[in-house]
């Protein structure tokens, strides 16, 4: 079975969800412009332009964090 992964930029409407994710990860929420990763519609990871990332510690997210890193590098190169 395949999961749908969606990556998009955070908006003001995502603040609460990102803070909740950071609390789960026991880390500070990424500041400024951030990329978010959703698996099957559920937020599982967030990454700032500076590289600060948080992820759901109860899910396998390494591949999602790698996708966020790749997307961020591509945007910075453009």
Language model segments and positions:
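Short acidic, gly/pro-rich beta-turn/loop elements at beta-sheet edges
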Residues: 17-20, 47, 51
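Acyl-donor binding region in acyl/amide transferases
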Residues: 49-78
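Short amphipathic alpha-helix that is part of the acyltransferase structural core
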Residues: 1-28
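Conserved beta-hairpin
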Residues: 33-45
């Amino acid at each position: 079975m395949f999961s749908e992964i969606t990556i998009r930029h955070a908006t003001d409407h995502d603040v609460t969800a990102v803070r909740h994710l950071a609390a789960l990860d026991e880390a500070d929420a990424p500041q400024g412009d951030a990329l978010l990763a959703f698996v099957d519609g559920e937020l599982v990871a967030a990454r700032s332009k500076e590289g600060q990332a948080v992820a759901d510690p109860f899910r396998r997210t390494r591949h999602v964090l790698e996708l966020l890193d790749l997307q961020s590098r591509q945007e910075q190169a453009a």
